Amino acid sequence: MCGITAWAGKSPKHFNKLEFDTILKFNDSRGGDSVGVATDGEIYYGIDKNKSYENFIINQNYLLPQVVPTVIGHARRQSVGLANIHNAHPFGFGELDEGFHFIGCHNGTLTNHIELAKKYNVDNNVNDENNKFI
């Protein structure tokens, strides 16, 4: 199953990216197909050569604010859907002028993803897309 790492403060607090990166590396064993980090309306993905947090942190120059209320990290292990940028987590939708309105991720496969895809007329090869319509 996938691995989720999150940091949340009651209000924006000083954020230590080095500590968060260290925790993300421990989460690598839960993924293997893609990684991602989301905060403050921005989402950064690592796929292919950057599909481990170790490589993602070294090769992907993702920037995080020093003061931030929430950060989500996700290491994806492929279940339904291809291992690609469209299925990487965290996922965002409801775009606003400055970033996404909603950001989320999940651990595991939705057991009724085929029924949801039919009901909402979405591609059932991409189970993460179904979340946008629930």
Regions found by a protein language model. Give the residues of each.
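Conserved short alpha-helical segments that host acidic/polar catalytic motifs at enzyme active sites
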Residues: 1-134
